[in-house]
């Protein structure tokens, strides 16, 4: 039982972190008005009545750019803590970050050669 006592804080925050959003969504669902009118069913286009269909086919290029953006956006999220603790990590931390960046550069070169970054 002593082993589990050091995890009390973790379980407390995990339970609270699950209860608060659940209560927020449940309260919102219970208190939200449920009367639907024709005006509420239309899509909002800056105050202008929409013309045509809302469902259009996107070109795959948008998805490729979005995927490449997300990959490099996540890279910055991982590199920021590394940059903040660079002086404490030493040579091994630098080598690990260098390997991480090199893997991403290889992925970028691969995407570039496959034509994922070309718009034509």
Swiss-Prot record:
Origin: domain of life: Eukaryota
Transmembrane portions of the chain: 10-30, 64-84, 89-109
InterPro entries to which the protein is assigned, alphabetical: NAD(P)H_OxRDtase_bac/plastid, NADH_UbQ/plastoQ_OxRdtase_su3, NDAH_ubi_oxred_su3_sf
Gene Ontology MF term list: NADH dehydrogenase (ubiquinone) activity; quinone binding
GO terms under biological process: photosynthesis, light reaction
Reaction equation(s) it catalyzes: a plastoquinone + NADH + (n+1) H(+)(in) = a plastoquinol + NAD(+) + n H(+)(out); a plastoquinone + NADPH + (n+1) H(+)(in) = a plastoquinol + NADP(+) + n H(+)(out)
Cystine pairings recorded for this chain: none
Membrane topology annotation: Multi-pass membrane protein
A single GO cellular-component term on record: NADH dehydrogenase complex
PANTHER family found in the cross-reference section: NADH-UBIQUINONE OXIDOREDUCTASE CHAIN 3
HAMAP family per UniProt: NDH1_NuoA
Recorded family membership: Belongs to the complex I subunit 3 family.
Function: NDH shuttles electrons from NAD(P)H:plastoquinone, via FMN and iron-sulfur (Fe-S) centers, to quinones in the photosynthetic chain and possibly in a chloroplast respiratory chain. The immediate electron acceptor for the enzyme in this species is believed to be plastoquinone. Couples the redox reaction to proton translocation, and thus conserves the redox energy in a proton gradient.
Name of the protein in its database record: NAD(P)H-quinone oxidoreductase subunit 3, chloroplastic
Native organism: Chaetosphaeridium globosum (Charophycean green alga)
